[in-house]
């Protein structure tokens, strides 16, 4: 998120603690001007951080009315957030929700606390809470006695005033999901994100990444479910086409579909539009790898079908495109070695296996084993058939 957007979001969070905030969703607590409560709040806002907590305690004790307790809890949340005492912020945030369940700014504050703490579980719990509050507000009918046109205008203005907070929540959620270290949890968070923001480019991208994460978590059924769901909505999603072409070809399943997906990905790689947030060099590298990956899957399909000459053609084309990705390059050369062996071209196979063993990847040891076998075979005289 840009620094400007972060600053705006944080300013809105601070502004939410002012009395009768117009951007607030939930209860509006009116603090009479010049009242004792008003003076106490002014003193809290002006106080040095080291003195704020005692003043907030005094305000909470001297104003037991439930509405004023809402204000007190808001002050506690703000104080503990600034002090980075996140568990205390959560404690008072829950107290605030008990008094004011639709307090949107409190939900945003809880998202902020969870994001800063790195608590992904709470981040998504409160993110879903924030989105639910907004959704309910958007769907709410006009209050009794309110003209529908006036209500539409008021609601639009309020939603516009909350746009930066809404953007902050969305970006905190997607950032938290991508940063989750456990692939199974990362996938689940991305799916939850997609449900909160359906029919958006961010949702589709999140699901594509979720499918890959499910595969990393060795949950192939969920990978297939999510990946096929993405393709049902966007048949040209190159990331998912590559994922499924790779999976099917490697397993020797649905080879015709794998070949179709791989060929489609090759074609799409030449027509994709570069996003604004990526350099020309980075973009060229990405589409080069994508095209090479697709060609490697084509080659693997041919290998599975015992079409070794076609496999050599596709894998050789992929070879030059995958050099910047050690893992994909090594696997491609390993496959190419077998394609050459099937054609009885030992010298070419040896070269391919040597290239596979030359980079640091899981295929190095396997390629070295094949090279040892080929070396032994070359030195061992062929057994003659009995006459």
Question: What is the role of each PLM region?
Answer:
Residues 17-75, 83-84, 125, 137, ...:
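N-terminal leader/linker segments that initiate helical-solenoid repeat arrays
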Residues 27-32, 165-171, 188, 275-277, ...:
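Terminal, low-structured helical/coil segments at or just beyond the last alpha-helical repeat
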Residues 38, 75, 109, 171-175, ...:
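"A position-specific structural signal for the A-helix of alpha-solenoid helical repeats
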Residues 46, 83, 117, 180, ...:
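Structural motif corresponding to the intra-repeat A-B loop/turn of tetratricopeptide repeats
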Residues 62-69, 98-105, 135-146, 160-164, ...:
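Short solvent-exposed coil/turn linkers within tandem alpha-helical repeat scaffolds
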Residues 78, 112, 178, 212, ...:
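Residue-level recognition of tetratricopeptide repeat
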Residues 112-139, 249, 259-270, 316, ...:
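TPR/TPR-like (Sel1-like) alpha-helical repeat modules
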């Amino acid at each position: 998120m840009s620094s400007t957007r972060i600053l705006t979001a944080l300013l809105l969070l601070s502004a939410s603690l002012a009395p009768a905030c117009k951007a607030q969703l939930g209860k509006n607590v009116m603090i009479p001007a010049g009242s004792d409560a008003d003076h106490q709040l002014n003193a809290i806002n002006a106080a040095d951080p080291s003195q704020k907590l005692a003043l907030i305690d005094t305000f909470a004790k001297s104003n037991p009315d439930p509405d004023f307790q809402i204000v007190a809890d808001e002050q506690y949340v703000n104080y503990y957030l600034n002090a980075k005492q996140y568990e205390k912020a959560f404690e008072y945030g829950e107290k605030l929700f008990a008094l004011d369940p639709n307090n949107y700014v409190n939900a945003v504050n809880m998202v902020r606390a969870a994001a800063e703490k790195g608590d992904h579980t709470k981040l998504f719990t409160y993110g879903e809470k924030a989105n639910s509050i907004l959704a309910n507000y958007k769907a709410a009918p006009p209050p009794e006695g309110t003209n529908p046109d006036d209500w539409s205008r008021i609601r639009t203005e309020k939603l516009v005033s909350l746009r930066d907070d809404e953007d902050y929540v969305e970006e905190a959620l997607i950032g938290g999901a991508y940063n989750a270290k456990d692939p199974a949890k990362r996938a689940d968070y991305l799916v939850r994100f997609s449900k909160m923001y359906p029919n958006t480019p961010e949702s589709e991208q999140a699901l594509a990444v979720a499918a890959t994460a499910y595969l990393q978590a060795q949950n192939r059924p969920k990978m297939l479910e999510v990946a096929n769901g993405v393709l049902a909505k966007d048949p040209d999603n190159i990331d998912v086409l590559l994922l499924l072409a790779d999976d099917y070809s490697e397993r020797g399943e649905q080879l015709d579909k794998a070949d179709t997906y791989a060929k489609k990905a090759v074609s799409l790689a030449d027509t994709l539009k570069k996003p604004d947030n990526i350099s020309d060099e980075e973009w060229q590298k990405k589409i080069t790898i994508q095209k090479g990956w697709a060609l490697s899957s084509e080659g693997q399909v041919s290998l599975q079908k015992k079409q070794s000459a076609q496999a050599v053609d596709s894998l050789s084309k992929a070879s030059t495109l995958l050099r910047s990705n050690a893992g994909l390059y090594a696997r491609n050369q390993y496959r190419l070695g077998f394609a050459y062996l099937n054609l009885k071209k030992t010298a070419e196979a040896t070269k391919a296996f040597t290239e596979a063993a030359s980079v640091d990847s899981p295929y190095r040891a396997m390629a070295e084993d094949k090279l040892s076998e080929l070396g032994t075979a070359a030195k061992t005289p062929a057994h003659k058939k009995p006459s």
